[in-house]
């Protein structure tokens, strides 16, 4: 969305799509523009906002981007408490802290409102992170510290993710989980300000901290301005033992089963792959690739989730 002039922020309760005993509803934060457009301010908007702010601060020649989602966090800060956002590091710190919660949009807005009521302007963006680490959190009905919550949630997420593809044949998938979660928990425990420190180390090509992180954990799938796709693997790993592309494939299968989506959005990525031959099935029935000799990530998930032979009712 190229231009989005924020005029209203609204909270809306939403029932979770899958019943469980712990969470019945979630809070969606809705942003409304002067033109009447409505968008959700949640994890994607916060993540993209933080990344775009950091890109502008540590790279050269950064291009302008649509207001939503890339400027969403800055727009919310300008709307609620503009004084807080005069130092962009404050916004980055708030984004980073809120992304550690299950309802980041709700926490982002609530925290800004608390800061405004207290007239709190940090002398250093680290104080924003400290605010969260000094405040107890509620996790699955229990009061925990931020560090305790981080460790227990990281372990739980790792256990759940490994259930998607089980067995020794899928160690490349488990490698990604161990590497990313292990790094994330370890780095946050050792240095809770590491996101801020990346920016403070300045220009990306001369940034020793970012270079170390990329060497250790690589980078997610990247799409550049030429619509080309790239991945940076951790040092010592090859694509054969580090299956990063299975994570977007999980989303594609979910979109098919829960939303009736027939097209696989990984087509641009697979078109660059030396092994996957994109054809009409990818647009109309990607699950039918389960009979191929070489299974793409979508088909591999479909087969190993015992869905072979199942045809979705769209």
Task: Report each predicted region and the residues it spans.
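Non-catalytic terminal regions of proteins
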Residues: 1-8, 64-314
């Amino acid at each position: 969305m190229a231009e989005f002039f924020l005029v209203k922020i609204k909270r809306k309760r939403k029932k979770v799509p899958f019943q469980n005993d712990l969470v019945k509803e979630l809070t969606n934060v809705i942003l409304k523009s002067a033109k009447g457009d409505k968008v959700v301010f949640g994890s994607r908007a916060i993540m993209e906002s933080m990344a775009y702010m950091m890109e502008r601060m540590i790279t050269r020649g950064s291009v302008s981007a649509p207001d939503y989602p890339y400027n969403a966090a800055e727009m919310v800060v300008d709307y609620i408490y503009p004084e807080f956002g005069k130092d962009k590091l404050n916004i980055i710190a708030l984004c980073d802290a809120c992304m550690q919660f299950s309802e980041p949009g709700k926490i982002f807005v609530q925290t800004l409102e608390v800061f405004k009521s207290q007239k709190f302007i940090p002398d250093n963006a680290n104080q924003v992170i400290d605010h969260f680490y000094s405040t107890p959190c509620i996790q699955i009905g229990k009061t925990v510290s931020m560090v305790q919550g981080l460790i227990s949630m990281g372990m739980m997420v790792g256990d759940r993710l490994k259930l998607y593809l089980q067995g020794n044949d899928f160690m490349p998938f488990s490698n990604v989980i161990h590497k990313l979660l292990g790094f994330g928990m370890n780095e946050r425990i050792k240095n809770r300000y590491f996101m801020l420190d990346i920016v403070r180390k300045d220009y990306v090509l001369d940034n020793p901290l970012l270079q170390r992180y990329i060497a250790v954990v690589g980078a997610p799938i990247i799409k550049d301005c030429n619509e080309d796709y790239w991945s940076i693997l951790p040092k010592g790993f090859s694509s054969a033992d580090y299956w990063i592309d299975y994570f977007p494939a999980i989303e594609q299968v979910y979109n098919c089963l829960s939303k009736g989506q027939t097209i696989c959005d990984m087509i641009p990525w697979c078109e660059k792959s030396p092994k996957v031959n994109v054809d009409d099935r990818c647009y109309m029935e990607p699950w039918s690739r389960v009979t191929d000799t070489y299974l793409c990530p979508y088909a591999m998930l479909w087969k190993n989730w015992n869905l072979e032979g199942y045809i979705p009712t769209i």
